[in-house]
Every structure is written in structure tokens, then in C-alpha cells.
Amino acid sequence: WSTPSRGLENIFITRSDTLFPRRNRSTITPTRIFTRRLHLADVRFACISGDFLLYLEARFGRFDKLRPEGGSATGSEFCNQDGKRTNGVIPIIDMAEKALKYPIGIQTFKDIVEGGYVYVDKTGFVAELADKYRYVFLSRPRRFGKSLLSSTLHSYFSGEEELFRGLKASEMNSDWMRHPVFHFDMSTAKHMTELQLIRNIGYKLDFYEEEYGNDTRIARDDVNARLERLIMEAVRKTGEKAVIIIDEYDAPLLDVMNDREKLLPMRQIMRNFYSPIKSLDPYLRFVFITGINKFAQLSIFSELNNLKNISMMPEYSAICGISQPELENRLKEPVQEMAERLLVSCDEVLRQLKRNYDGYHFCANSEDIYNPYSLINALSDKEIKNFWFDTGTPTYLSLIHISE
């Protein structure tokens, strides 16, 4: 802590080293603080004296923890939120709860909602899909929010109504039925041999067999029969139709796309696993499949001819990613914080974000869609850089380049 002076013009702060290095943590006059446009979300604790607090309240409106007692503005008469005197000229303000939390790397809807993270409401799309369709396929690039959307559907069909309070889906759905949900994340099955892939699928089925039981007469590697029995047993036990969510269905095949000898047997394993879906129609409430490739390109769902591909439908162009109106209206506060950190206007921040991250169009005359991973990282770090490419080499593009 800095030692306060008797003057009324000083603010004393401790914060991260990014804006003020440790050697410069000292008395900061109003001129310095506003020249550098320090945002109060960057402040962990503040020691403020006298009239300067009133000026800050008028300037920022963020000091809701302190109130002057009896209309006096002298530091010795400040009291904290519970009405107790601070007995001195150093009232302490905890600003940690003011900082926005960004869901970097978090792909679970429940964790984002319960953790109070920044969230752009996509639940209206979820409720609409659940109402209009039974079998849905969505193709989007990597790091584009497919897994979060899948998780949101999982919570929706699990009847977790409390997670959707205040969100669009709560206005559209009055019947929160709890369905048995089978959620398969195939991103965990990358870079595997045929035997490893079968075992990986088997482990995923083990999880649901712990809840709904297994049939010892079915061979462990007969994943087709195990999936079929699981769905039928879940419907029998719960009395409600089942939901199947397959996230990144094509992940096991991406690294063998240019090797036909390896691709064919791996594709056959996946085709065999997914094949019961069509015959299970009487037992299914909803099926949702995501991937990078169109399902027709890999011929895995050739038997599932009732799959609705919404990937290039205009009304779902913003189902993943962030649209321009969402950025300007729902992410207004993060944009403002970034502008203050970079010492530029909000319009300039929007211009830079647009130039770097909104190059996606998923149908004719599509609105501009921002890559959510890059955009959220930029708002969190308050800087412009190539976040998407830094996460790893885009394998499929690399393979295409090699094959050419």
C-alpha cells in the first residue's frame, strides 16, 4: 500500500503489472489517471480521500460500495456499505467483482451460466430447433462454438430450466421435459487406430450403461447393438423419448482424409456405430450432429436420409459465432473496456475487430459472422492478434496442401 497524503486529490491503487509496473505503483494524480484512461475494472483495491471520490463517482458511477455520511465530503466521515464508519481517510473498495469474466476454453453451458461468464444468448436458436425439427446437422469451422451449442442443447433437453432463466429460451418454452440425453463428443477419438477407435466408442457407451444397464449377451466391441439397446432401455425406464447429440462426428477421420487405405475402415466403424439411428426413430425426440465436413462428403450418414442440414440456411447463419448486432449490443461493455485500455474510441475498436475476425459468411447474402474464439480472446486480452491460428495447425487444410 502507498502511504496517503493529507491532500484530497490522490488515488492509491494496487493492480496487475500490465498497466503500471511495480516500480511505478505510487500516488497517481487525477491528471495522470485520466490521461492514461485507467478503467476501474482494472483496480483491485483503491484508497481514496475526500472530494476526489465524489469526482470519481460522478465520472464513472462505479463506486457503489461507499457513501458519504451526512452529506459531508471529508474523508474521516466516509462509511462503508453496511453503514459503519471507516474511521479514517482510507476507505477500501474491492473492485474484483466488477471485472468481466470471459469463458476462455469453457464449452459447457452450465459452467458458463453458473460461473457468471460473458455469454451471447443463443438459446432462442436452441428452442426453435427443438420445436421445428427432429434430425439436424450443422457444419462449422473449428473453434466456432459447436461444442457450446451441443452442450446448450444437452441442458435444454435435460430439463434444466433454471439455467435458462432470463434467456430467450425461457420465453419460448413452457414445457421443460426431462429426456434421456446421449451426448457423444468424438473430438476425443482423434489420431487413433481402428482398434483404439472401437475401444473409445465403447468407453463412451460404458458411461451410459452405468445408468441404464448393459446386456452381457452383446459383445463389447459390438457398439452398434450396444447403442441400440441403450436407447430402447432408456426410453423404457424414463418413459420419455431419447435425445442423441454427436459433437464433431468427423473428428476421428480428419487425419486420415488423404489416406484412402486408412480412411475406408475407419469410416466403416463410424458408419456402423451411427447406423441404428434411423431404425430408432420411434424412440427418438431429437438428433443433433455437428462437424467440420458436410456429412455427404464422408458418406457416414447415407442411411439417415431425413437429416436436415441447417449449415447454410440464412436464419441460422448466426447460430454459432457472433453477429455484428450481437457484438455492438450484447458485448458493449467489453468493447468499451477494450477501447479504454487501447486509448481509442469504441468505434475504432469495432473497426479493428471487424477487420480481423468477421470474415465468415455461411450463405448467400449472409450477415458478417465473427469467429467467437478469436473475438472473446481479443476482448479478454484487450489486444488484436491471430488467436485462432495460435491454437494449432488446421490439420485438414494442411493435408489438402500436402495432397496437392
What are these regions, as identified by a protein language model?
Residues 233-235, 265-285:
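Substrate-engagement module of ASCE P-loop NTPases
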Residues 70, 398-404:
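Residue-level detector of conserved catalytic or cofactor/ligand-binding positions
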Residues 299-303, 310-378:
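Amphipathic alpha-helical segments of the small helical/lid subdomains adjacent to P-loop NTPase cores
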Residues 162-207:
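P-loop NTPase motor core
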Residues 1-6, 10-16, 22-26, 32, ...:
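Low-acidity, Ser/Thr- and Arg-rich intrinsically disordered low-complexity segments
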Residues 239-263:
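Conserved P-loop NTPase "ATPase switch" module shared by AAA+ and STAND
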Residues 245-247, 272, 285-292:
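Structural recognition of the conserved hydrophobic beta-strand(s) that form the central parallel beta-sheet
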Residues 90-143, 149-157, 163-168:
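Walker A/P-loop-proximal flanking segment of P-loop NTPase domains
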